[in-house]
Amino acid sequence: MKQTIVAWEAHLAQNRRRSVHTMRAYVATAHRLVEFLGAHWGAEVSSDRLAAVTAADLRAFLALRRSDGLSNASAARELSAVRGFLDFVAGEGTTPRLKGPRVKRGVPRPVSPDEAVALAEDVADSAVEPWLAARDWAVLMLLYGAGLRIGEALGLTGAVLPLGATLSVTGKRAKTRIVPLLPRVREGIEAYVELCPWPIARGEPLFRGAKGGVLDAALIRRAVQAARTRLGLGDRTTPHALRHSFATHLLARGADLRALQELLGHASLSSTQIYTAVDAAHLMDVYRNAHPRA
């Protein structure tokens, strides 16, 4: 089954355009499922056996996972991964129907504009070298000032240089969108590029780790965690909270919901609305008029 899981991982990367984080989680789920079914059935797990898996088998697997302390949200993600894996092995639509746990959607808690800037400044001030300080500031300003996901910011390459008034961003499932760049955000990136000791070619990562490799999102998360403790901010003050704040502050200042969908790269803000195209000029006007740091 190891080869089957490897093939599924390649399928996720090539055909489903899943992020590295999602692929790791899904592959881990597949390994857990195979291990569980082997013990549950008392027999070696094969592709043919997986094709015959029952709803009762899946309920038993989820019950075991829930006994490990899995939340409803995590259990729902686990079930989604299981369905995807079984559909890959046995064919689309062959997985037994199983109702997932009800997930209560939490309300994002944004930080204030002043808190967002203070957070970025504190992270930058804690860096050991000026170019690392400039890097961390630029990354966090992309999250708050342009609404990028951390993975989108770290996925940027030298192809975005030289910077203009907008930025082309590749988001989830390889969807590309155009986001305006506030002067302050653009200046932050340019300051980092000028100080960065590593050459940034078109195909190279824009944001580098201390040794020149790709900057790890975990490093930014840890830096934010340390900064929020020093500043007395809540534990929900994360890199992603800056993106939530971007959206919340724009809406509070009258930004059009459909324009915001485009800026965030969401299929919908309510999980039911469709992804709406808005012309770039209108997006720029909405952005300049609504963003508190514009």
Q: What kind of region is each of these model predictions?
A:
Residues M1-A294:
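Conserved catalytic core of the tyrosine transesterase superfamily
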